[in-house]
Curated annotation (Swiss-Prot):
Residue ranges occupied by any SANT domain in the UniProt entry: 297-349
Molecular function via GO: histone deacetylase binding; transcription corepressor activity
Organism phylogeny: Eukaryota, Metazoa, Chordata, Craniata, Vertebrata
Gene: MIER2
Functional summary from the UniProt entry: Transcriptional repressor.
Subunit structure: Part of a complex containing at least CDYL, MIER1, MIER2, HDAC1 and HDAC2.
Any Pfam family hit: ELM2
GO biological-process terms attached to the record: negative regulation of transcription by RNA polymerase II
Record-given protein name: Mesoderm induction early response protein 2
Cellular component terms (Gene Ontology): cytoplasm; nucleoplasm; nucleus; protein-containing complex
PANTHER family: MESODERM INDUCTION EARLY RESPONSE PROTEIN 2 (PTHR10865:SF27), METASTASIS-ASSOCIATED PROTEIN AND MESODERM INDUCTION EARLY RESPONSE PROTEIN (PTHR10865)
Length: 545
């Protein structure tokens, strides 16, 4: 309806133009009138207007018949008629073709859809289109009165055609580009898309030049060595040889060597020894007997004799496995002896061996402790490496008291007794006879221990029918300090000596039995007591039983 109103506003000029041109007496009846309709610049042909159903000439005749009517009334009548006229007829009156809007929309949609351009934005092309559009508008506005106008539908058809030409150019260009891309794809090799396995003579390298100079050379520098040939001896003889080698039956026995149903353990070293002996069984067994590195089995392979020899060699040589192998176990290597030693230490046989070894001797160390491994590292009693055991508790302890400055039996003269006679033992004083009174009382303590000068020794007689036996008791009274208050014969006490300045030496007498001690004590005189000794230094009680 907006178009209708605009046409209504433009209708007075059209009517006036038509009135002047169609009135009788006017010369230009069949001339063409150019009517300007605003900025649209539409051109109308008068013949087309007259060809419509509504006759404008009749209206003009009526207007001429009534010359009394003013122009204003005529214009009003035309406007009223145009207002009552349908929109399609009004368009036809002004030169527009009536068309179906639905069909137009379908046709436009169908035409534009296949001709859609590329949706990519080209800035240069857009700028050119805008500039050209502005220039065209300027030229058209300046030449509105000079150039004839065309109908709106013809003008509207120009833009799609121009854009359609551009679309067609794009369409013409797209198949070409697709064709070029197809040719490029066809030019690519097939290996790029699908990988092939390179197998065949055409993929192998030519190494003929490298083999020309090696025809006369050996492939290996060292010659091959034959380790075993199964086609020389029968299988039964080979099994008997292995059985004798494993069981260490070196001498040939009458009858079959291999029991029935006995499984034979394979030994590659024994078979190799047989090959080196040119398949001589006896010679191979003789070599195996003296070759200790051939057969290597576990602990169960050691015979009872080898185990006893190893234990005896361990007593003699300790952990010197080289001497054990050379002197005791010649059928074994040093490595096998070491391996057997560590397996033997974890067995019950070692516990029994250690228990029997500790019964006869104990090794004395400065710290006063006994190491079990050091006990077993010694040798047998006849060997030179055997350590000397400690003195027996019944015969090995000294019975003479200690003194700092010994007047009769000093520590600096180990081989001389108090009476000037030489002693056969290396001790500072010989043993006392059992029938002599001891220097220290047995059951009585001094009455006044605080005063050393008032100390007097007490003499007790031994029992006549008691068997001679020595018992030594080292016990210090808890209420007395550990000091030495040696009293001189004149009764004046000497200077006390601190415990750190007193050294206690124990003489080793070896293994001396009671029968050896009695004749020794009877043959030598006793060593009298050199003087008074303090009980706090060493409370030594000599008892006879």
């Amino acid at each position: 309806m907006a178009e209708a109103s605009s046409l209504g506003r433009q209708s007075p000029r059209v009517v006036s133009c038509l009135e002047h041109s169609l009135c009788p007496g006017e010369p230009g009846l069949q001339t063409t009138a150019v009517v300007s309709m605003g900025s649209g610049d539409h051109q109308f042909n008068l013949a087309e207007i007259l060809s419509q159903n509504y006759s404008v000439r009749g209206e003009c005749e009526e207007a001429s018949r009534c010359p009394d009517k003013p122009k204003e009334e005529l214009e009003k009548d035309f406007i009223s008629q145009s207002n009552d006229m349908p929109f399609d007829e009004l368009l036809a009156l002004y030169g527009y073709e009536a068309s179906d809007p639905i069909s137009d929309r379908e046709s436009e949609g169908g035409d534009v859809a296949p001709n859609l351009p590329d949706m990519t934005l080209d800035k240069e092309q857009i700028a050119k289109d805008l500039l050209s559009g502005e220039e065209e508008e300027e030229t058209q506005s300046s030449a509105d009165d000079l150039t004839p106008s065309v109908t709106s539908h013809e003008a509207s058809d120009l833009f799609p055609n121009r854009s359609g030409s551009r679309f067609l150019a794009d369409e013409d260009r797209e198949p070409g580009s697709s064709a070029s891309s197809d040719t490029e794809e066809d030019s690519l090799p097939a290996n790029k898309c699908k990988k092939e396995i390179m197998v065949g003579p055409q993929f192998q390298a030519d190494l003929s030049n490298l083999h020309l100079n090696r025809h006369c050379e050996k492939i290996y520098e060292n010659e091959d060595q034959l380790l075993w040939d199964p086609s020389v001896l029968p299988e039964r003889e080979v099994e008997e040889f292995l059985y004798r080698a494993v069981k260490r039956r070196w001498h040939e026995m009458a009858g079959p060597q291999l029991p029935e149903g006995e499984a034979v353990k394979d030994s590659e070293q024994a078979l190799y020894e047989l090959v080196k002996c040119n398949f001589n069984v006896e010679e191979a067994l003789r070599r195996l007997r003296f070759n200790v590195k051939v057969i290597r089995d576990g602990l169960c392979a050691w015979s009872e004799e080898e185990c006893r020899n190893f234990e005896h060699g361990f007593r003699v040589h300790g952990k010197n496995f080289h001497l054990i192998q050379a002197n005791k176990v010649r059928t074994r290597s040093v490595g096998e002896c070491v391996e057997y030693y560590y397996l033997w230490k974890k067995s019950e046989r070692y516990d029994y061996f250690a228990q029997q070894t500790r019964l006869g001797r104990r090794k004395y160390v400065p710290s006063g402790t006994t190491d079990a491994d050091q006990d077993l590292d010694g040798s047998d009693p006849d060997g030179p490496g055997r350590p000397r055991p400690e003195q027996d508790t019944l015969t090995g302890m000294r019975t003479d008291p200690l003194s700092v400055d010994g007047t009769a039996g000093g520590l600096d003269e180990p081989g001389v007794a108090s009476d000037g006679l030489p002693s056969s033992e290396p001790g500072p004083c010989s043993f006392q006879q059992l029938d002599e009174s001891p220097a220290v009382p047995l059951s009585h303590r001094p009455p006044a221990l605080a005063d050393p000068a008032s100390y007097q020794p007490a003499v007790t007689a031994p029992e006549p029918d008691a068997s001679p036996r020595l018992a030594v008791d080292f016990a210090l009274p808890k209420e007395l300090p550990l000091i030495s208050s040696h009293v001189d014969l004149s009764g004046d006490p000497e200077e006390t000596v601190a415990p750190a300045q007193v050294a206690l030496s124990v003489t080793e007498f070896g293994l001396i039995g009671i029968g050896d001690v009695n004749p020794f004590l009877a043959a030598h005189p006793t060593c009298p007591a050199p003087g008074l000794h303090s009980e706090p230094l060493s409370h030594c009680n000599v008892m006879t039983c």
